[in-house]
Amino acid sequence: TRAATGTAATPISAPFSMPEGCERANRCPPGVVEDDLTWWHRGGLDLIGPVLVDTHVSERRRELRLITLMTDIVASTGKGPEAGIGLDETSALTVRKQADGLQLEASGQSGVWWFEAPDERNDVSGWTLRGHYLAPGAIARWWNGRIQTQGNEPAYMVRNSRMLDGGDALQAEGLRTALWNMARGGYAGTALDAAGLRLAVRTTPETHYWQGPQGQQGLTDLILELSPKSDRRH
């Protein structure tokens, strides 16, 4: 399954919507406007199971769009994708089928987001899920709904218990930049603004860390939580 213009649409707020174009070109599908988030409900080739794939994710600040779509599919159909995969133009993910799951290896100049199925929404606008940023330089395995690295990647060492101010999650490459700065500084997490909401990314005792060949930062087992901005839980 992939994020694309299709026949089923879920309206969401403007910061997560597609760019201008289809209305001006008079090419919007019937009943769809530019502020609708749309997806192709029949899915793709289903080569690796029920996963949702989107492109230019960090470059065009689409991480929250991808996660929002995952939660909306669950809300509308009762069953969502097992994972959401976020690629960029200069990154790739090689997926190899194995008897005990999928082997995953990122390559390129950045890396790949892998979001697990989100929990139920914690309020009108919020959600919690587990995510991983797969940078080049390590091989991971997806099995039974969880990611495991297959090398000797060390556990993430927290050197600063504070939450790093990550800026705006809806700026291009904003979330990825905040995550990498968090890892370089050894912070316990990072918090970002997101259209009046607050996005918190926290490490866990299960988080493993590695650095890619071009300085990319790879981290597993992160908890991402979107909540009202007034909620300052740490």
How does the language model describe each region?
Residues 1-12:
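Catalytic nucleophile loop
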Residues 17-234:
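C-terminal and late-domain segments of enzyme folds
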